[in-house]
Amino acid sequence: MAVGKNKRLSKGKKGIKKKVVDPFTRKEWYDIKAPSFFENRNAGKTLVNRTQGLKNANDSLKGRVLELSLADLNNDQEQSFRKIKLRVEDVAGKSCLTSFYGMDFTTDKLRSIVRKWQSLVEAHVDVKTTDGYVLRLFAIGFTKRQSNQVKKTTYAQSSQLKEIRAKMVEIMRREAEGSDLKELVQKFVPESIGREIEKAAKGIYPLHNVYVRKAKIVKTPKIDMSKLLESHGEAMDANTGSKVVKSGEFVEPEILESV
């Protein structure tokens, strides 16, 4: 008789399946709070794994970038072509406090404004706001057909396009560097920067469909909790804490009058 293990007997029973655990039982929902310069503060909810061992749920949420439609944030369907990025900066209870992290156009909007027989003008520039944010702004515009024009095309000369780009850069830099981040974001929605570019370029070549199509955060200053809470419409107590004595620093105790 052969000595050894019987391979058939050592195998487990067939048909026994491993117990499947629903991954959503280990997760919990957190509310997304948009900054106060948006009308709808409750932007939505996000999922994260519960705090377990050394893994903290708050650490997993901080730095998370969320993309939302401006139509949902401002309750205005006409702004549905703008996508807003928000980044989670801090977690308070079950609420994620976010800050503005970027803006972009939807693909269908960009494709809808491109037309034949006209010149496309694009420019980008890095700007710094008064509160220390560095953004890269991208502008787009198109040459406009005149009312008394006979020619079919509205192509601008390369020298004219160069002048228009210089005007775009100048206006974007001027509008951004004189504003903080909140004021700059509020200029994107009514397209006040685009109208300024149209006025400035009128003497070079008339434009239409001029937009700041994209805004990208390049550099952010160190997060100040008081400013973050202020942007969310929450006030901090002035007496947030008391001075802590450094280790190794001796402080003589006060003399008591009576014991």
UniProtKB/Swiss-Prot annotation:
Q: In its UniProt entry, what is this protein called?
A: Small ribosomal subunit protein eS1
Top-level taxon of origin: Eukaryota
Its main localization is cytoplasm
Keywords (A to Z) from UniProt: Acetylation, Cytoplasm, Ribonucleoprotein, Ribosomal protein
The modified positions for N-acetylalanine read A2
Q: Which family does the UniProt entry place this protein in?
A: Belongs to the eukaryotic ribosomal protein eS1 family.
Q: Which GO terms describe its molecular function?
A: structural constituent of ribosome
The subunit structure is: Component of the small ribosomal subunit. Mature ribosomes consist of a small (40S) and a large (60S) subunit. The 40S subunit contains about 33 different proteins and 1 molecule of RNA (18S). The 60S subunit contains about 49 different proteins and 3 molecules of RNA (25S, 5.8S and 5S).
**One cellular-component annotation, GO:** cytosol
Q: Where in the cell is it found?
A: Cytoplasm
InterPro entries associated with the record = Ribosomal_eS1, Ribosomal_eS1_CS, Ribosomal_eS1_euk
Name the Gene Ontology biological process terms.
Answer: translation
